[in-house]
Each structure stands twice: as C-alpha cells, then as structure tokens.
Amino acid sequence: MPGSTWELHLLLLLGLGLGSEQALPPPCESQIYCHGELLHQVQMARLYPDDKQFVDMPLSTAPDQVLQSFAELAATYNNTVPREQLEKFVQEHFQAVGQELESWTPGDWKESPQFLQKISDPKLRAWAEQLHLLWKKLGKKIKPEVLSQPERFSLIYSQHPFIVPGGRFVEFYYWDSYWVMEGLLLSEMAETVKGMLQNFLDLVTAYGHIPNGGRVYYLQRSQPPLLTLMMDRYVAHTGDLAFLRENIETLALELDFWAENRTISVSSGGNSHTLNRYHVPYGGPRPESYSKDTELAHTLPEGSWETLWAELKAGAESGWDFSSRWLVGSPNPDSLGSIRTSKLVPVDLNAFLCQAEELLSGFYSRLGNESQATKYRNLRAQRIAALTALLWDEDKGAWFDYDLENQKKNHEFYPSNLTPLWAGCFSDPAIADKALQYLQDSQILNHRHGIPTSLQNTGQQWDFPNAWAPLQDLVIRGLAKSPSARTQEVAFQLAQNWIRTNFDVYSQRSAMYEKYDISNAQPGGGGEYEVQEGFGWTNGVALMLLDRYGDRLSSGTQLALLEPHCLAAALLLSFLTR
C-alpha cells in the first residue's frame, strides 16, 4: 500500500529478540536424539559425513543405560571422549540406520492405471510407467518394536505403511506427502493414501499438529499445512464421506495449532489483520544438522545463538531450508547466520491456510454443520482481505512476503509469490493474467528448464539455479485457472519445460531427483547435503502434469518446444488468435 503508515502489533513476541539469558526448551526430551553431551560430542566429532545418520540410529539398549555408560566413559577422559573411543561407543550401543524400517510393496499397486492411456508420446508413456513403478521402491513400514520400545528409536511410530521421499529421507515428511498423494491417486492407490492420511490424523491427535517429519527431533516444528487439502483430494477421488465425518474435528484441530501458535496481527490505516508466520521457539542446534548449526553459531556473539537456532528451525518449518527469502532485510543477507524467518509473513503459508479454511468450510457444509461452515468461511474472507491489504501489490501483479521489522514487502521473485492463485484465495478473476505479466516482467519465462526458486545465487538449495517440483505446480496450476487461452498456453509451456528436464535427466541417469539445476538441466546442488534420488514429490508432480497435459506433451524427439523464443511465439500466437 504506497504511502500507508504501517503500525505493527505482534501477538507472539518469542523469537523476535531473545537475550542470551533466555534459554529455550530443546526440540524434544530425549537426551540422546535431541540434546545433551552425548549428542554434542558425537556430532562435533563428525563421525559421519551427514549428521542425520547418528540421530537416525536405533539404540541397542535402554537409553538410561546408554547415558550411564557414556557418563562413565566421559569421566575417564576428563569429559572429552577421543574420536576413536566415540566410534567404538556408538558401535557398541547403537544399531545401523534403517533397522526399524522394512521395505513395503503397496497392496493396491496395479500394473496399468488408466491415466497412462492419456499420454500420447510413447516415450513419455513408458517413462510414466517407470515412475508408477517407483512407488514400490519408496514404500516403508515401521517394525512393531518401535511401538513397544519407542524410547530406543528416534523414529515416530506410524500404524500404516507410507511412501517416503527417498535417499536420506527414509521417514515421512509432511508437505512432501501432499504431492506424493496426488501421484498415488493417479496411480489408483487410494488405500495407500488413506493409510498415510490416517497416520497424519493420528499425529494431530497425539501432538496437536503434524511434525516436520517422522522423527522425534522434528516434533516441535511442523511444515506447510496441507492436511486438509490431502483429505479433499482423497474424498474427491473416493467419495469416502464416512472417513471425512470421522476425522473432520481433527482437521479443525490442526488449524487450531496454527491459529494458536503461529499467529500475528498487523495493523494498517486503523485496520487490524490476522496472519500467520513460521515460528519455532525451541533452542539448541537442529539434531540432524548439529555440527553445521553449532559452527554457524560460533560466527556470532554467544548471546544470539538461541535466536539463530530458533530461526533455523523456523526456516526448516517453512520447507524452504534454506533460502535468501529468509535472509532478506538482515544486516548481512549473504550469511545464513542472519536468518530471520519468523520476522516475515509468508505468502505461501497464508495461502495454504486460506485454502484449508475454504475446504473445511465446504466439508462442514456437506456434513450439515452450517455454524462451523460459516466460521471457516468467515476466516477465509478475513484472510483474503489481509492478503490483499498487506501482501498484494497491484502494480506488480503478485503477492509478496511482508517484513515485520522493516514494515515493507520483499519484492524479490519467488514462485511462492503466486501461491494464492494456486490456492484459489483471490476475488478478482483477472489476477491470473496479472500473474502472467509478473512472470514476464521478472524474466522467468526465459528459463527453459524450469521455474527458478529465486533469482539469487546464494549457494542455498532454495535459491537459483535450483528448481523444485512443488513450486512448478504452484505456478503452473495457478496460471491454468485463468480463463485466458494465452495464460493457459503459458502454463502448458512451463509444464513442457519441466517434464522435458525431468525426462532428460531420467534418460541419462535412470533416477528422479528432489531438485534440478535449471542452468544445465542436471540434478540440483547447494544446501546442507548432497542431492537425493527418489523422489516422492518430484514423481508426483511429473505424474500430475502428464495426466493434465498428456495429449500434448512431447519427449522432445520430434519438436523443439523448449527454447525461450517458443514461449514468446506462443504468447504472440495467442494474441493473434484472440
């Protein structure tokens, strides 16, 4: 709002200025997997290339015995155990990663789901068959001993088997699972989806929210809230209203978590608007990235360590771990030590919640509870008003994250800026065409291998030149909502770009990846770990695009559809034919 005088009121102050004397609680109670001297010494000794490996190891004996043995060992070395002795201790008291999981072949997997017949290009159809086959490789089931002896594991027990992302990610992850479920439903695997949904509903019942992932060290942070959307897709596919009726109050309970723990109020021109942010007021380094978080903290004054660690967890809660998006507005935006996730009101989080409010209102109406339907309908209307007042920029044709401290929008490009379009949280039908103009103005349509995560090359994995499958979906399906043939054609061309990149890399490497480098159409890089194969949400988005555009998509062997001038030609053609 140009010329507005902004007045900021924060309802939650934790995390916006913690002093060194204000120690935050650890991410979980375990003195092995979440905090304590054993965790510290093992991780700082860097026994493994990836810190996640140690905190994923099951215990061989009871945790009290392990801690007592470690205390005795440490006492013999003046409390600093040599690396060789640490290695021996871990070998004696811990089991190899993955012992508590077993591979699982989904019982509802079938040879030839119907959507494959919609794919005209024979090479793409054969590739889609391979992607469909990957569900068998990504299925996991938790062994019963995790239920009977939970204290010996960092894994959180889930009753039903599930599909994992792949690579180092052998447990469930919250927001990944939405795009996985979309792919599973296309593969006609509704029973697998129902089981995964039930696991998530059980977690909400137990903890009040869905953790970031299926480990105890993830317990105090969530991820983008897509549970209600998952339920919507399952019910739309199956018509299973009984399952919805049984669990609708649990869906409402999850939204209560975000309302009670992640809410802020921002005033503009005398009007107060309630929105949400990512915010994890828990201390200590992330156990799965312990040494990196500790090293990063030592580049800062000791009094700011707790704030740093809380902001890193908030960045992980966003799903974008990490990105220039969470560094903007800081004194040193090139350093991860300046991360300030909780100081920003994210476009995507509020769009996801807006969509969930709309869906929940519709669910209650279908089940005959009009008072609850009205409640969530009103919450959605209030959120759309807040999105429009605080995050929408009419001149640029997009929404932007709002900086609470600096009281201004972050006008950098991120695909998340268009999430309200994907989520249907807008009132002006012309917004999709404005979004297209925004993409053109930002020169995003010049990238022929995918939509970049940002235009800033920081070395963080959620920045240029990486592109991620869910962000392609946000933009493509958002544009596809437009009644304009021109905008719909650009959505198709963006889908063609992404499918070609995925297909080409698969043709070279026989693998799907969590992210791609659009500067060279290869697997992505950067961030805290090596690029991972699998890969759940990448497979899901590819199947969604193949289903939506299967009659038009090309493997590229006959037509060169992907050069930047092709997009320009498509736009020109659409103008001439309107």
Curated annotation (Swiss-Prot):
The keyword Protein biosynthesis belongs to this UniProt entry's keyword annotation: no
Lipidated positions per record (GPI-anchor amidated serine): 555
Pfam families: Trehalase
Residues that make up the propeptide removed upon maturation: 556-578
Its EC number(s): 3.2.1.28
GO biological process: trehalose catabolic process
Membrane topology of the entry: Lipid-anchor; GPI-anchor
Compartments in which it is found: Cell membrane
The protein's assembly and partners: Homodimer; disulfide-linked.
Family indicated by similarity: Belongs to the glycosyl hydrolase 37 family.
Role according to the record: Intestinal trehalase is probably involved in the hydrolysis of ingested trehalose.
Alphabetized PANTHER family for the sequence: TREHALASE
This protein's name: Trehalase
Organism, scientific name: Oryctolagus cuniculus
Source species taxonomy: Eukaryota, Metazoa, Chordata, Craniata, Vertebrata
